[in-house]
A protein has these predicted regions:
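Interhelical loop/hinge segments that connect adjacent transmembrane helices in multipass membrane
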Residues: 2-24, 123-124, 186-189, 198-238
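Hydrophobic/aromatic end-of-helix segments at the C-terminal termini of transmembrane alpha-helices
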Residues: 39-44, 239-248, 264, 280, ...
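Interfacial/gating helices of multi-pass transporter permease domains
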Residues: 43-66, 124-126, 222-226, 245-267, ...
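Small-residue-rich hydrophobic transmembrane alpha-helices
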Residues: 53-103, 142-146, 150-153, 255-304, ...
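Hydrophobic alpha-helical transmembrane segments
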Residues: 161-173, 179-208
Length: 347
């Protein structure tokens, strides 16, 4: 199996051709939905949708991030491929446990959504957030399967899921947003995530990546140990962010603008970084350190600097938002995300 790095003269290491192919597929999977977000923003503008309600997903999505991180990050180590392939029984056992845990948390969140929204100064978005909770549960299925495909170097399946998602999202948004406004965006997400999840599971079975089995005690013990550590860390980070930033943003009635700014940062600027981190996690046996990844980070940062003068026009045009206002939110955050770039690839 090829690993994330190979030795060169002098001990310096680099990504392999196979890794670059996977990296490209992951970037497409992450970036093309951002391209579609440009279309969604136009749909939102045409249908006079309340962007401040849709912007509440900014903090609500942190719940999903905590669960996904706690459940999947340990699996990059526990589901190590044998002879280039992961064990189908382990994959299935991990999936069954993960979806059960996620479902329980989803029910709890839905039962407490009124109190959560009130705490975050988002009482006007209770219905939207309630539906989004179901959407995130459906979306987790696809997210889990993409992890399985990534571990098995199946970039073709990742690309197929991407194309399917984009086509379905176009149709779903036009149907649901035009009929149900802001809540329609949540309905569209449920529909698309459910279909993509079904396609992903069937594809995984068809490829032999899943075979029914229940998890063993030793496997669960190791999973819980790593997951608890990772989950607590990301929970503390996100809780502080939600309370200190998102709650304050809601208090001054700016969730819509902050949501757009965050979409620009995470949907465009940080995509190469997050995808690089995914490739690194997959190839955990040889850790990528600053000695051999600095070149990739510098290239990413160089692209930022080159394109920075055009950011405001991009936000004003394709993103159909107030570029002057959004750029004032984005620029002060850049130093923090430079730090994130470094930490993401060496954690």
């Amino acid at each position: 199996m090829q690993h994330i790095v190979e030795k060169e003269n002098g001990g310096l290491k680099k990504m392999t051709k196979k890794d670059f192919k996977l990296y490209g597929s992951l970037i497409l999977y992450a970036l093309l939905p951002s391209v579609y977000l440009l279309i969604r923003m136009q749909i939102v503008a045409v249908n006079d949708v309340n962007i401040d309600i849709m912007g509440q997903i900014e903090w609500f999505d942190l719940i999903d991030e905590v669960l996904v991180t706690a459940l999947t990050v340990p699996l990059y180590f526990l589901l190590k491929p044998d002879n280039g392939k992961t064990a189908p029984k382990k994959n299935c056992a991990a999936f069954l446990v993960s979806i059960a845990v996620y479902a329980v948390f989803t029910v709890v969140v839905m039962l407490k959504i009124g109190s959560i929204a009130k705490f975050m100064n988002a009482e006007n978005a209770v219905q939207y957030l309630f539906i989004q909770a179901l959407s995130m549960l459906a979306g987790f299925v696809g997210t889990f399967m993409v992890m399985i495909f990534t571990l098995n170097d199946d970039d073709k399946l990742v690309r197929r899921l991407l194309v399917s998602r984009l086509c379905l999202q176009v149709v779903a948004d036009w149907i649901f947003i035009s009929s149900f406004k802001d809540v329609g965006a949540a309905y569209a997400e449920i529909a698309v995530n459910a279909v993509i999840g079904l396609i992903a599971v069937l594809s995984a079975y068809g490829k032999g990546y899943l075979k029914f089995a229940m998890p063993g005690k030793a496997f669960l013990k190791d999973w819980c140990k790593i997951g608890a550590f990772v989950g607590i860390q990301i929970f503390l980070d996100n809780f502080i962010y939600a309370v200190m930033v998102c709650k304050m943003v809601n208090a001054v009635s700016e969730p819509g603008n902050y949501w757009v700014a965050n979409n620009f940062i995470w949907g465009w600027l940080l995509v190469p970084v997050t995808c690089l981190a995914e490739v690194i996690k997959k190839n955990d046996k040889v850790r990528l350190t600053m000695k051999n990844c600095w070149r990739y980070l510098i290239m990413i940062f160089a692209v930022w600097l080159i394109t920075m003068p055009k950011w405001k026009y991009f936000i004003s045009g394709p993103m159909a938002s107030d570029g002057a206002v959004i750029i004032k939110i984005v620029l002060p955050l850049i130093p923090f995300y430079i730090t994130y770039m470094i930490s993401a690839v060496i954690d």
